[in-house]
């Protein structure tokens, strides 16, 4: 091998000189010394230290050399004892700096100062001594070998710029100053044509303008201020990193190009750490701490074994191999994410979680350690490299992406993420369960007039109180209604309170005991009623809420103007054998009839035929799967395309139903699925001001009645989980911009366009297949999410409507919380300025194998098809029922499950809120302790409000605390103005709303567990206006509760209410 290296050295000596790029320094100011050398003023020049260098040759080979050839050629440059092989050298001396001017390549990190040609024996010997042992080069050697032409070509632009700046030259025309004009075509070079740009020009400038010349060069060569300690701290501290990283990062990367030229310093140092080349101990005992001068650091680097031989020759090649291995393994991640971006139909928030999880799974510390062990080499020779194939990409696919692939198949998704739990009832037990847990058969049977209790919220509270007075002697619990802002500061805590909704739902679901009339008979004043009964919320005009519990109703009055005669349906079915065309034709006929809103009245009894929202009762069984679809749009959807998409939606939903209810017989080609869509608005002129659209509440917030509003949180706070679940917004905020369609009867070929521009509101109703019923809010929420997953995995659905949709969070699951409500089909919503709009009308999606089209069309108007708790058709004689009471598993989100597992594995267990509050001597289960603790923290919260929201600070001077939601890791407490104060409501802190009715907001203090298991106290608000996301909870600021032993904080202005 030595003979071969010698032959290569002889061939090189006869050819071109060895190219050397040297990073140098001096003991004093390197810029002053360098200019002295350039101007041939050797008295001001200092010896030059070369502490890092790069050597290469230009062989001019036409064929690209292999990696092994490059290694051998590079190793042949280095002498075993130090220095370089060769008889002549062209050395470019550099300092830290950047070349001026744009380029498509990576910018260099050094800037050349002068070029020298070492050809004479004594000069070459001096250079070899400097490279091998760190001996400083004397100024006379630099001056004797200076290549003036090449050197001053580097400085021509600098000399020219200095000449122009010093002489204030500018290109202009005109003989005097008054006539002078700027000449854009004039060349600056023509103005300084008599100025020498070589050594003479620089010398002249330096002699006459030394300060400006030094300042300019110091700005251009910002390496002039670097000290030995700077280089040691940046590129060290160990010997290998100091020598190899400095050489590659500053000198070799730009010359070699490739990805390495774009890597930052830390990345190169990380690569250097896996270049584990063995070497003998240094003969000296020099430590990094002793390298306090350039003489010491130069001697240390030049005598290092990493600066010569195979170790020096192999490192640049190893950087290329290591980068290629990293990119190869990580590109699998990029490819999967790119693929999933177009086919993994999840919400934006969930996809972001997926991206973070993918990177965490692939680049977790254990996997990275395995990868680094695989790519570590112990031999610089590429032919003998000890690197192994890295398992990083393969493990990422096996451990993460294979599970993600399972999300793209609904069967695998249910298999891995859903564990249904059901209870089987038969005979009399099944019959008794259905009678006790579904609406009484007469409740949804058409009748000439309604029977029930209907009244405004205020009057309903009084009627409930009167009914409860009759029931209390018979064992009914007493509830005292709480008025908004009730002041309890000066006395005993108030009696137990409960809102309208909870009391109504409890009355409506209570069974009849023997011959005694049911409890709700005391409210309805009719002993013949049977329970359970449906409970409704009604939006009044212009504002306010009403409530109803109905034993029966005149359903024909509600649906008669939006129904088709059986003869018409039969005729259309005979004329249009294609069910898709038939469904669109029948839908167009409904629209062409011009359904009008039933006349409403100022009283609740009339208004309930305009707007009605079924309140979900968590105590009852669910017999109809009612889905609330809110499709956010990029642009309007052609109706034909929308209708086709709904057909694909039906197919995907039924695929999920078959998997969730395996004991049921579900024929996907014949099973009924009913669709209703909010009527399109005819135009802005008919709807009112655009600012009013979208502000109506189709959900559960009762702005005028805090006790009713509190009921929204009473049973199932999970519906508004702002920490983990996707936002569950109510349908009213999305549907309000829709109105009744045109009256003209379009032809099928017209392909009408749905005029909804922002969102499409839909109801999808499917009977729970016999013999199943569903029980529980969480179970129903899980069913809806599995159905959404199945629909989004239907390729035809995504292709049909995907280009029109902004995001794929389609189904709102917040409606399945106890006490939440959902607008019924055939009813409208109430716009903020009063008129009813957006009536939900049928869209007929006829099953492919439907045998009786008229019956299917008529079933859309059957109230038993679109109520959550309607009595099933087999109620009279059920042989067996299966109660699905839990989906178990992690159906909520595969990505959330992975995130939770990773957090536990890598960051330790997060304490529960109960454990954290226990350190403050607060017991969440003990009455009033959490409220009292929050009251103590109010002083700090009010101080923040005074600082950041000074105009609202006065509203919080007299507030009390009332618990709203309690969870294992989250407690929400509402701030309520004390009764009797001037301010009886709290204003929105996020925005200034034009309308006073929109300025009112509910304000909460949230207690949660933050990082490092510390207690976090957040101020949150829920504002009704669309500008504030329509009742969505927003966190305004968060403070740290401090350590339990910290001094007590200022207390609030009143005692907490229970």
Swiss-Prot record:
The record marks 628, 630 as: Essential for primase activity. A zinc finger (CHC2-type) spans 988-1028. Pfam families: Herpes_UL52. Keywords: DNA replication, Host nucleus, Metal-binding, Transferase, Zinc, Zinc-finger. It is an enzyme of class 2 (transferase). One of its GO terms (cellular component) is host cell nucleus. Its EC number is 2.7.7.-. One of its GO terms (molecular function) is zinc ion binding. One of its GO terms (biological process) is bidirectional double-stranded viral DNA replication. It is found in: Host nucleus. InterPro entries: HSV_PRIM. Coiled coil: none annotated. Essential component of the helicase/primase complex. Unwinds the DNA at the replication forks and generates single-stranded DNA for both leading and lagging strand synthesis. The primase initiates primer synthesis and thereby produces large amount of short RNA primers on the lagging strand that the polymerase elongates using dNTPs. Associates with the helicase and the primase-associated factor to form the helicase-primase factor. Belongs to the herpesviridae DNA primase family. This is DNA primase. It comes from Human herpesvirus 1 (strain 17).
